[in-house]
C-alpha cells in the first residue's frame, strides 16, 4: 500500500512540475505559446514511445538469440511467462560485461527481456531464474510504459530550458530576454530534479518486481543472493566506457551501477 502511495505522489509531483513550467511560460508569453509547448511535449512523448525500444536495443548492444543459441535461457523465460499469464517475450543477450538485466517494450505483447554477458557469468541458474522472474514482473506490471512516460518529463524540461536560454524563446528574447533566461534556468534545475525523481520511481517499481518474482515461484533467498552479487559486481566494475554508455539506461536496470558503492556500504 505504501509503495502505491509513493508512486502516486511521485507521478503527481512530476506532472505538477511540468504543468507549472508550461503554465509559467503561458503566463509570460501568452496562452498560444504555452499550447505550442504542450503540443511539442506530446510529440516528444509519442516519438520516445515509438522509437524507445530501438534506442535501448542499440545503446545496450542487445543481440536477440534463438532457442538453439540459448536453450536454457529461453526455457526459463517461457516457464515464467506461462506462470505470469504473459506472451513469451523476446529474449536477448546484451554484449556488455557489466552484470545486469533489464526488460523493456511498449506493451505486454511487445515485451523484451535481456541479460548481459556479465550477469550470465556471475549468477547460478536459480539466481538467474529469480532475476528473470523479476524482469517479467516488470512487463506484467507495465512498468516500462510507466517509466517511459515519466522519463519523457525531464527530456521535455531540458528542451524547454534549451529553448528559453539559447533559442530566443521563439523570438521574444528582445522583449524580455532576462525573463526567458530565468525561466530557462528554472527549467534546467527542474530537469535535474525530475531526473532524480524518475530514478526514484524506477526504484519503487523494482520493489514491485521483487514481490512479483516471488509470486512466480522464485525463492526469495535466490533473489537476495543474486542482488547481493550484482551490487558487488557493479561496485567492482571498472570499464568507464561501458559505464558511460549505459548512463542513460540506468532507470531500466535491475541494479543501478551508479549507486553500487553506496549500496555496498549499506550492506
Model region roles, listed by residue range:
Residues 65, 108-109, 122, 126:
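Juxtamembrane helix-boundary/capping and inter-helix hinge elements in multi-pass membrane proteins
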Residues 1-102, 151-203, 207, 217, ...:
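Hydrophobic or amphipathic, alpha-helical segments that drive membrane association/targeting
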Amino acid at each position: 500500500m505504501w509503495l502505491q502511495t509513493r508512486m502516486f505522489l511521485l507521478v503527481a509531483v512530476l506532472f505538477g512540475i511540468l504543468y507549472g513550467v508550461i503554465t509559467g511560460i503561458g503566463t509570460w508569453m501568452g496562452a498560444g505559446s504555452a499550447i505550442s509547448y504542450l503540443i511539442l511535449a506530446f510529440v516528444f512523448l509519442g516519438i520516445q514511445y515509438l522509437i524507445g525500444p530501438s534506442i535501448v536495443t542499440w545503446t545496450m548492444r542487445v543481440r536477440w538469440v534463438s532457442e538453439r543459441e540459448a536453450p536454457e535461457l529461453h526455457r526459463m523465460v517461457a516457464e515464467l511467462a506461462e506462470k505470469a499469464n504473459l506472451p513469451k517475450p523476446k529474449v536477448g543477450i546484451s554484449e556488455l560485461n557489466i552484470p545486469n538485466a533489464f526488460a523493456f517494450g511498449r506493451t505486454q505483447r511487445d515485451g523484451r527481456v535481456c541479460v548481459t554477458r556479465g550477469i550470465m557469468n556471475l549468477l547460478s541458474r536459480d539466481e538467474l531464474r529469480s532475476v528473470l522472474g523479476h524482469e517479467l514482473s516488470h512487463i506484467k506490471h507495465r512498468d516500462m510504459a510507466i517509466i517511459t512516460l515519466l522519463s519523457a518529463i525531464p527530456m521535455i524540461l531540458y528542451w524547454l530550458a534549451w529553448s528559453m536560454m539559447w533559442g530566443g524563446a521563439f523570438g521574444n528574447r528582445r522583449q524580455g530576454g532576462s525573463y526567458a533566461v530565468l525561466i530557462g534556468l528554472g527549467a534546467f534545475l527542474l530537469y535535474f530534479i525530475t531526473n532524480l525523481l524518475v530514478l526514484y520511481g524506477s526504484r519503487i517499481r523494482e520493489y514491485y518486481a521483487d514481490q512479483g518474482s516471488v509470486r512466480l515461484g522464485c525463492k526469495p533467498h535466490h533473489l537476495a543472493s543474486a542482488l547481493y552479487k550484482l551490487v558487488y559486481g557493479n561496485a567492482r566494475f571498472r570499464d568507464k566506457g561501458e559505464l558511460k554508455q549505459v548512463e542513460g539506461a540506468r532507470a531500466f536496470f535491475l541494479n543501478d551501477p551508479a549507486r553500487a558503492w553506496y549500496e555496498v556500504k549499506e550492506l
